[in-house]
Each structure stands twice: as C-alpha cells, then as structure tokens.
Amino acid sequence: MPKIKTVRGAAKRFKKTGAGGFKRKHANLRHILTKKATKRKRHLRPKGMVSKNDLGLVVACLPYA
C-alpha cells in the first residue's frame, strides 16, 4: 500500500499538541496593523486551537502527525 502524502501547506501551519489537538496562528496579524488597536494585536499573538468542526480536515491533511 502506498504512503499517504502530507499536505505541506498544512504541515507548516499546524502543530499537534500532546492532547491530540492542533495549534494554529491567528489571522489578521500580517499587514495593515496601524489601524488595529494594540489590545487587539496583543490578543491575536498567542496561538489558537483548531476547532472541533475543522479538526477532521486538519487530520486528513496531516496523516502522520
């Protein structure tokens, strides 16, 4: 049986946690930052978790994670 290919874009975006979830970076922190409040940018800084609704898609993209 052939190996399953990992989606390389997903491998760069998600990291698996010990509990089986996936960490991800928040959106809206790349450009046009001057009009965004400091508090908003600060809250976007820490990693978020992939929601349970999207978990199946991420797992399918990362078969060996």
From Swiss-Prot:
One of its GO terms (biological process) is translation. PANTHER family: 54S RIBOSOMAL PROTEIN BL35M (PTHR33343), LARGE RIBOSOMAL SUBUNIT PROTEIN BL35M (PTHR33343:SF1). Belongs to the bacterial ribosomal protein bL35 family. PROSITE patterns: RIBOSOMAL_L35. InterPro entries: Ribosomal_bL35, Ribosomal_bL35-like, Ribosomal_bL35_CS, Ribosomal_bL35_sf. It comes from the Bacteria. The keyword Ribosomal protein applies. This is Large ribosomal subunit protein bL35. GO terms for cellular component: cytosolic large ribosomal subunit. Keywords: Ribonucleoprotein, Ribosomal protein. HAMAP family: Ribosomal_bL35 (MF_00514). It comes from Yersinia enterocolitica serotype O:8 / biotype 1B (strain NCTC 13174 / 8081). GO terms for molecular function: structural constituent of ribosome.
